[in-house]
Each structure stands twice: as C-alpha cells, then as structure tokens.
Amino acid sequence: MNGFRVLLRSNLSMLLLLALLHFQSLGLDVDSRSAAEVCATHTISPGPKGDDGERGDTGEEGKDGKVGRQGPKGVKGELGDMGAQGNIGKSGPIGKKGDKGEKGLLGIPGEKGKAGTICDCGRYRKVVGQLDISVARLKTSMKFIKNVIAGIRETEEKFYYIVQEEKNYRESLTHCRIRGGMLAMPKDEVVNTLIADYVAKSGFFRVFIGVNDLEREGQYVFTDNTPLQNYSNWKEEEPSDPSGHEDCVEMLSSGRWNDTECHLTMYFVCEFVKKKK
C-alpha cells in the first residue's frame, strides 16, 4: 500500500510538470522559469521505507580469508608404528677398567723339557754374593736420596711427601689428587709418628692432614670417608669449634691434631700408594 502511494505521488508530480511546459509553449504567462528552475524550488522528500524484497540468489564463493591464529595443542595421539632401524652410530668412549676376573682353570701340563747342563756354580755364587752387596748399598743410597735430597718418607705400603706450597684445605686436596695421591691420612701410631718426625725435622710447625668434618659437623672422617674409629691423636681439649667454622685438621710438629679453619693456608702432606711389583 505504501509503495502504491509513492508511485501515485510521483505520477502526479510528472503530470504537473508536463502541464506547465504545455502552458509555456502556448505563450501563456504562467511562469517564465525553466523546468529545472521550477523543479529546483520544489523539495522532493524520500518516501517511507518500502517492504523487504524477495531474497536474492546465492552469490559466488568469496576468496580465502587470512590464516587464523594457531589453535591450542591437541590431545596426544596414539603411538605410531615402530620405524625402520637407523644406521649404526659412532662408537662411544672407552669405559672404565673392569674388576679383575676370577682365576682361570689350571692349564694342561706342558711337554717335558730337555735335560739341562751340569752347573759349575762355584764361580757364580761369588758373583751373586757381590751383586747382593751392591744391591744393599744401592738401597741404602736410594733411601738417602729419598729422605734427604727428595724429602720423602715411606712405609712398606706408602710414600709421604711434604708439599712446601701454602694452600688452603681444598686446594691441598686437589693438589694431591691430580698427582695420583691423597692428603695424608695417619690411621695408626706408626704413620702419625713418621709424619710428625718428618714435619719437625723439616723445620715446620704445622701441616694440613686428610681429616675433616665438612660433611657433618662434629663427625670427623679421613678424606677417603672412613671414620676415626681405630685411631686419632687430638691435642688436649680438641677438637673445639665454638663458632662452627673449624672443619679441617692440622697436625702439629708434636704429632698432635688440632681442628682449624679450612680457608687458612699452610704446607700439607700428600701420601702415595706404592705400586705392587
């Protein structure tokens, strides 16, 4: 209905315009202005909104839009099939030397050897005796070189050496270890006396030894983590650590032990295990 009214008004406006033009063509003094001027004085307002038309056909498919943001991580999928075996990798480093194996079975007896010649041992005994004397003298000379010149002390199983470089406790541990030894551990009276005599005759007053309570306060152990169960030689009223900072041990030239602070620097004694022949 609204559309019909709009159409009717539009047709009436056109009829009026045509009538004016017709009167002008007849010379009648109706209005001397042009049709454009006449129309310009009339304001044509838009009509009311019409009814919705029928829905048009579906348009063509548009272009692909921009790629959206990455979505959240999905749920872990099922385990896939085992892949083909890969190439053989590089050989790894050589492992540590294993433990010594058990003694093997006794082998088959060998063939009987050829008969030996009769020995004229008289002259050889004299040579052997002279060699024994030479070896004894050589051992005495070697002991002199070790003790006096090189400054080494030894027992049947170990060598002991005073390192005349002032280092703190941890540096002393490292120094001995990188040279194949350990900070000296006097685990019995014999070794303790040997080291104390060594220190005194070298003209020193104190040295670091391999005893500490760095792991647990008050529980002193040797540097190989064995406890002081069988032997210790503390100075009277030692160990005493009221401030809790004296976690390392020094040996005095008297052979007595004293707990001291680990950051202090002094000479120290390394021990080395003798290689078995």
From Swiss-Prot:
Glycosylation sites: 11, 258
Similarity comment: Belongs to the COLEC10/COLEC11 family.
Chain intervals for the UniProt region annotation (Disordered): 41-103
Any one GO MF annotation of this record: chemoattractant activity
Cell compartment(s), UniProt: Secreted; Golgi apparatus; Cytoplasm
Physiological role: Lectin that binds to various sugars: galactose > mannose = fucose > N-acetylglucosamine > N-acetylgalactosamine. Acts as a chemoattractant, probably involved in the regulation of cell migration.
Residues annotated as domain Collagen-like: 45-103
Keywords for the protein's UniProt record, in alphabetical order: Calcium, Collagen, Cytoplasm, Disulfide bond, Glycoprotein, Golgi apparatus, Lectin, Mannose-binding, Secreted, Signal
Tissue: Expressed mainly in the liver and stomach, but also in muscles, testes, and intestines.
Alphabetical list of SMART domains matching this protein: CLECT
One GO biological process term: defense response
PROSITE patterns tied to this protein: C_TYPE_LECTIN_1 (PS00615), C_TYPE_LECTIN_2 (PS50041)
Signal peptide interval: 1-27
Domain of life: Eukaryota
CDD domains in the cross-refs: CLECT_collectin_like (cd03591)
Organism: Mus musculus
Gene3D superfamilies: Mannose-Binding Protein A, subunit A
Residue stretches of biased makeup (Basic and acidic residues): 49-67
All residue ranges annotated as the C-type lectin domain in the record: 155-271
Residue pairs linked by disulfide bridges in the UniProt entry: 176-270, 248-262
Identification of the protein by name: Collectin-10
InterPro entries: C-type_lectin-like (IPR001304), C-type_lectin-like/link_sf (IPR016186), C-type_lectin_CS (IPR018378), CLec_Tetranectin-domain (IPR051663), Collagen (IPR008160), Collectin_CTLD (IPR033990), CTDL_fold (IPR016187)
